[in-house]
Amino acid sequence: MLTEDSISHLHGVERPLFVMDQWMYHSRMYAAASYARTRDDLDVIQLNSFGCGLDAVTTDEVSDILTNSGKIYTCLKIDEVNNLGAARIRIRSLISALRVRERKQECRTVESTAYERVVFTEEMRKDYTILCPQMSPIHFDVIEPAFRSCGYHIDVLPDSDRAAIDMGLKYVNNDACYPSLVVVGQIMTAVLSGKYDPDKLAVIITQTGGGCRATNYISFIRRALAKAGHANIPVVSLNLTGLESNPGFKITPGLAFKGLYGLVFGDIFMRVLYRMRPYEKEPGSADRLHQKWLKICQDFVSQKHVSHRRFVQICKGIIEDFDKLPIYEDMKKPRVGVVGEILVKYSPSANNHLVELLESEGAEAVVPELMDFLLYCFKNSEFKADHLGKKRSSARTARLGIIAMEWLRKPAVKALKKSVHFGTPGNIDEMAEQATDCLLYTSPSPRDSTSGRI
């Protein structure tokens, strides 16, 4: 009986892998599996204690490394029951299968573990449809035309239904977290619908670069496409960290500005619509006002060249128009915050239409701005530079990102401050400072070498 760290140094891993290889224990597992696949006298049993979506990522990869070279993969979920009866049965089954193979003297071929991804080229950009999974309809309704105006044939998929969730369960390891099933289910439903030519199709997905399974959405999607016989479909990584590059997709200044304008518009709509709709005197009036301004915003981001002055005017116009919407001023309803994992927080289907449910039950829903998530990502880079030894250059870039985003939404914040009914989003630096009283202290910071506070 050998542990993974006793043999992982004996064989390197042929890269790139399907997954983002960024965790030391899992890297040793991949190396150990790569070595085991080259030998007939060595087999692997992976012990797995379910924690989150990362377990699905790593067990899938170890399975691929072994099974693609004709080896048997066995995974024991050690947290399922208190007794080991089930584990004993699995191990006995493995031993029995190995003996059968030995008697039959089956031959196998050792295959490379490297994955050759399909690159999205400049030629593909001209006539390929790019599928984008839905996350937040109130934002993506504006962001989609922004991408199209920059020459990308983007199709934002409809919000998931039960069929899409079932499709996700079919093509994704069922130990993966729910958002992974939702995203992959949307994409595979569209790919297999017959609506699109699979030879003229690409998929785009964000890739955060963090330790969460969100960095590995892209591997879930590629694995699902390969299972369905569509490994030829390129999957484009939308990231700001240089994880993957595609010649046919580039974040130009024009695309970045239009996308961020759309993000600000979506945040404004979310704040003013959710604030006024529960109190409207005329049912449906808030939604009609939303549709009116949505069309204006879509037309704005669809222009070849956008004016920041016009952006400021639209932000001010939306807020002032909603501020004048007739509502029951004397009515007070409980305000309920909606927080949590990013997709479940913003996607109506993923959260079982929670905002609608709250409003129907006599409450007012409050959902944080999507831009706050991007600000958090930048702030996190500063934290890593202060406490975890990351490059100071990344912290300086992150600070510039925070300054740019706060400047972009400054017109909205200014108009919200002047309004009667609306509050303003919080400042990321102030929130981080306040959080130091709630969170565990880290190692001492350069800014405060005695307390360990940021």
Which role fits each region the language model picked out?
Residues M1-S443, R447, I454:
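An N-terminal assembly and electron-transfer interface module characteristic of large anaerobic redox
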